[in-house]
Swiss-Prot record:
Residues 1-103, 558-587 are annotated as: Disordered. ATP-dependent RNA helicase involved in 40S ribosomal subunit biogenesis. Required for the processing and cleavage of 35S pre-rRNA at sites A0, A1, and A2, leading to mature 18S rRNA. Associates in the nucleolus with the 60S and pre-60S ribosomal subunits. This is ATP-dependent RNA helicase HAS1. Residues 1-11 have a biased composition (Basic residues). GO terms for molecular function: ATP binding; ATP hydrolysis activity; identical protein binding; RNA binding; RNA helicase activity. A motif (DEAD box) lies at residues 265-268. It comes from Pyricularia oryzae (strain 70-15 / ATCC MYA-4617 / FGSC 8958). ATP binds at A156, K157, T158, G159, S160, G161, K162, T163.
Length: 587
């Protein structure tokens, strides 16, 4: 971007970061900021901390929620305080590349190494320090058009290296336009989950180590006041979750009128978890003259609708998976085991005991199931970490990084950890509760065998009534084989488990919550032909939670089965199951 002909681009001064009496105008219409403060107030100097300080402070919540404490990583020594004009290349970041431009796609015409991209010295230095030399396919095909200002709609498997694919062009753009804190936010990256946002923030921190531009993060559960303070000082590259970003756009006086680039990562997941309205509002508030990048593992109708409103006409479409034989990464050995519901827990317990020296992630379908099984396993000296959406952000952050830094151990979690997270050296992915569909399966197993020539294994538990799910996996090009577990290797701890749950009030209460949530999750499965709640054997399911007889729990089937048009009544399931132990018909 350096060697293009120069052209002047005016970036308006962010003079009113703390505009008095005009909060509404500042948020929705930043152009109405008044120059009420001195240059020094507008563009405060933010000290650049040591690497050790960054590691200790960046990720803690109340203090790191001051996760924007590191967000102010800025050097203002080269600021010309009287100059608001920023030099830009002739082809601007939101430039006028024709929508029908055909870019070369053959391997011969693509750069293979980062050093061939003509990146800035500071960016190249950071990439080398991060240990990267060769580009992945999404990086080879995505970075050059993004550097040229093209809008991109990308489809790539998790673990494909897309984080660097969108961060490198963003950082180069900020450097090229000489963004300073007073210019406000030039790049926004939207992520579906807090953990993924923290991970992207970590990559951005490493990539921007030698640049003077500022970076920060705003996520739900973090200290909102600390975030607002950092934003008011000027955050050039902002990573955010949708809900908290919309909150700040509407209620925090900060400058985003100079936005040049919007990145929407894991767009399908953002929409799946219910942020469609927030995303539409965010796009409506942000400046229209910008470059946009949208990445999604699957191209659903909703994703296409979001792409239509967020991208300019004629975006470049990149699909690095279309020619692959399988939908999952190479080096991943995938298997399943078919067992009755009452044998599920003892099989899982035996597996974890046998694999104590491995690094394992176990997926469950609900927060309460994760909570219960974590309490149970830790109580019986099978140490595990747990991660789910009901935890406070501080706990989630600490757990995530503790597991990332561990050489071995077990993390049990909900799908909050299934998307995008780059956890090093995971040996096994265990899907104790089945995924909602093949897409979720692919994202779950994507936590292992990440990177070039990496190996990993996955294991999925299926009930005999659920084997039809294998047909859907085959249609989705997912190769799985049946694993066999010798009976002699299984530790039969069922009777001890039932005694423990019978006498321990705390575990008993937690088990009931887990049992109820499991039924709710099962009732809400999208593949009803495979995961039919009426085929569940209640007595056997209860045994997997440690109950000798099913507890009496009330669930609202109508609420769970939102896709069913019929009104579902409230009914109790419990100590007197119908003949055969099944649910029978819903009322």
């Amino acid at each position: 971007m350096d060697d293009r002909s120069s052209k002047k681009r005016k970036l308006k001064d962010v003079n009113g970061a703390k505009a008095s009496g005009a909060a509404t105008d500042v948020t929705v219409k930043p152009k109405k900021l008044k120059k009420a403060q001195s240059q020094e107030e507008v563009e405060p100097k933010v000290e650049k901390g040591s690497k050790k300080e960054e590691e200790e402070n960046d990720w803690s919540d109340e203090e790191e929620n001051e996760a924007a404490d590191d967000a102010g990583h800025s050097s203002d020594s080269d600021v010309d305080e009287g100059d608001d004009t920023i030099a830009a290349p002739a082809k601007e970041a939101d430039g006028d590349i024709p929508g029908d431009l055909t870019l070369p796609t053959t391997a011969e015409s693509e750069a293979q190494a980062f050093s061939e991209l003509n990146l800035s010295e500071n960016t190249m230095k950071a990439i080398e320090e991060m240990g990267f030399t060769k580009m992945t396919e999404i990086q080879r095909r995505g970075i050059p058009p993004l550097l040229a200002g093209k809008d991109v709609l990308g489809a790539a498997k998790t673990g494909s290296g897309k984080t660097l694919a969108f961060l490198i062009p963003a950082v180069e753009m900020l450097r090229s336009l000489k963004f300073k804190p007073r210019n406000g936010t030039g790049v926004i990256v939207v992520s579906p989950t807090r953990e993924l946002a923290l991970q992207i923030f970590g990559v951005a921190r490493d990539l921007m180590k030698h640049h003077s531009q500022t970076y920060g993060i705003v996520i739900g559960g973090a200290n909102r006041r600390a975030e607002a303070e950092k934003l008011s000082k000027g955050v050039n590259l902002l990573i955010a979750t949708p809900g908290r970003l919309l909150d700040h756009l509407q209620n925090t006086p900060f400058v985003f009128k100079n936005l040049r680039s919007l990145v929407i990562d894991e767009a399908d997941r953002i929409l799946e978890i219910g942020f469609e309205d927030e995303m539409r509002q965010i796009i409506k508030i942000l400046p229209k003259e910008r470059q946009s990048m949208l990445f999604s593992a699957t191209q659903t109708t909703k994703v296409e609708d979001l792409a239509r409103v967020s991208l300019r006409p004629g975006p470049l479409y990149l699909n690095v998976d279309e020619e692959k034989e399988y939908s999952t990464v190479e080096g991943l050995e995938q298997g399943y085991v078919v067992c009755e519901a009452d044998k599920r827990f003892i099989l899982l317990f035996s597996f974890l005991q046998k694999m104590k020296k491995k690094k394992i992630i176990v997926f469950f379908s609900s927060c309460n199931s994760v909570k219960y099984y974590a309490e149970l396993l830790n109580y019986i000296d099978c140490q595990v970490l747990d991660l789910h959406g009901k935890q406070k952000q501080q706990k989630r952050t600490n757990t995530f990084f503790e597991f990332c830094n561990a050489d071995r151990g077990t993390l049990i979690c909900t799908d909050v950890a299934a998307r995008g997270l780059d956890i090093p050296a995971v040996d096994w992915i265990v899907q104790f509760d089945p995924p909602d569909d093949p897409r979720d399966y692919i994202h779950r197993v994507g936590r292992t065998a990440r990177g070039t020539n990496k190996k990993g294994r996955s294991l999925m538990f299926l009930l005999p009534s659920e084997v039809g799910f294998l047909t859907y996996l085959k249609q989705a090009r997912v190769p799985v084989v049946e694993f066999d577990f010798p009976t002699k290797s299984i530790k039969n701890v069922q009777s001890q488990l039932e005694k423990l749950i019978g006498k321990n009030y705390y575990l008993n209460s937690s088990a009931k919550d887990g049992f109820r949530s499991y039924l709710h999750a099962y009732a809400s499965h999208s593949l009803r032909s495979v995961f039919d709640i009426n085929k569940l054997d209640l007595a056997k399911v209860a045994k997997s939670f440690g109950f000798a007889t099913p507890p009496r729990v009330d669930i609202q089937l109508g609420a769970s089965m939102s896709k069913d048009k019929k009104a579902g009544g409230r009914r109790a399931y419990g100590s007197q199951p119908r003949q055969g132990g099944t649910y029978g018909k819903r009322r």
